[in-house]
């Protein structure tokens, strides 16, 4: 019988949304075991290329821009608005932001597994989810009480 890894929460996708979700879980439930599964070889890979490498995070028309500012500020990332109303990190370096967000997530106690593609998700009758994960050619099973899919696009 295969060994099953158990987590309070699993997040599929280590992009900006997945990492932000993981940080938020740890903020409100510091003792929770959180796993982020990413099929690519690097977390926040697309984030590192956004906004021509400057990382356009939001804009003035965003309904909840205070929430966006608050999240980034709490995680040590200061934003600025350009003349067109777009928000960027003060560093204007998307790669630096991707690295910082990944480091903050790991520092918070979140486990990030790269090269880990989720092949199947099954809801358990008693609650929670079983995930079949292919990781570097081997299959493993993960059980999570809660599941968030933040897989993004192709």
Model regions and ranges:
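Beta1/beta-strand and adjacent pyrophosphate-binding region of the FAD-binding site
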Residues: 2-17
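Conserved N-terminal glycine-rich FAD pyrophosphate-binding loop of Rossmann-like flavoproteins
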Residues: 6, 39-63
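Glycine-rich FAD pyrophosphate-binding loop
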Residues: 10, 26-49
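Short glycine/serine/threonine-rich phosphate/pyrophosphate-binding segments
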Residues: 18-22, 151
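Hydrophobic anchor at the start of a short beta-strand
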Residues: 32-34, 79, 147
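A short alpha-helix-loop-beta-strand transition element characteristic
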Residues: 43-47, 64, 69-71, 75-88
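Short beta-strand to alpha-helix junction loop
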Residues: 63, 83-103, 113, 154
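Predominantly flavin-linked oxidoreductase catalytic cores and closely associated redox partners
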Residues: 104-154
């Amino acid at each position: 019988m295969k060994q099953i890894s158990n987590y309070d929460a699993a997040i599929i996708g280590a992009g900006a949304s997945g990492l932000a979700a993981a940080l938020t879980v740890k903020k409100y439930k510091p003792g929770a075991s959180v796993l982020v599964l990413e099929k690519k070889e690097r977390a926040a890979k697309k984030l590192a290329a956004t906004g021509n490498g400057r990382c356009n995070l939001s804009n003035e028309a965003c309904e909840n821009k205070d929430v966006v500012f608050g999240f980034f500020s709490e995680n040590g990332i200061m934003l600025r608005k350009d003349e067109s109303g777009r928000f960027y990190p003060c560093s204007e370096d998307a790669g630096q932001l991707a690295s910082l967000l990944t480091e903050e997530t790991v520092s918070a106690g979140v486990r990030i597994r790269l090269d880990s593609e989720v092949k199947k998700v099954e809801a358990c009758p008693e609650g929670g989810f079983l995930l079949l994960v292919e990781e570097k050619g081997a299959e493993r099973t993960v059980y999570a009480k809660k599941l968030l899919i933040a897989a993004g696009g192709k």
